Amino acid sequence: MEVFVHMRGKDVELHNPEPTTTAKELADEVGHPDAHVFLEGQDIAVKPDSTLADAGIGDRANVHVSVCKKITVSVRYNQQTKSYEVPPAATLESVYARAVSKGQGFDLSDADRSQHTLQVQGATDQPDLSRHVGEFANEDCAAAFDLVMQDRFQG
């Protein structure tokens, strides 16, 4: 089977574990023996002794390996900041959806939503929203983004 492994500060890596590989063995294989394994879209880490198959991790699944069980994400827009606690395998798309929503977010109009994206604070990087929040977390299990106008390339 093929599994896409996401980790903090690294590009996505393709691994070929057996379905009988445990979450602990996968964490060991990627060089993070003390880390937790999260299936994309799940809030709770896979139990270390669970096999990938038993945990519902199938072929071509996306998992995140992280020492953090939760990431504190802050999103800044118009001199205001909203914070959320999410699992490391949460996608930036899910954070973006909360940040632009009414109630939990900044209540952007549909027109404004289509023109904005997340940008890493202190940088010009506007990462693809399919990436995991945990890829951007620091050692304190926190990540910070600005809600900005999307870069538009014309050519």
What are these regions (language model features)?
Residues 1-155:
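Ubiquitin system architectures
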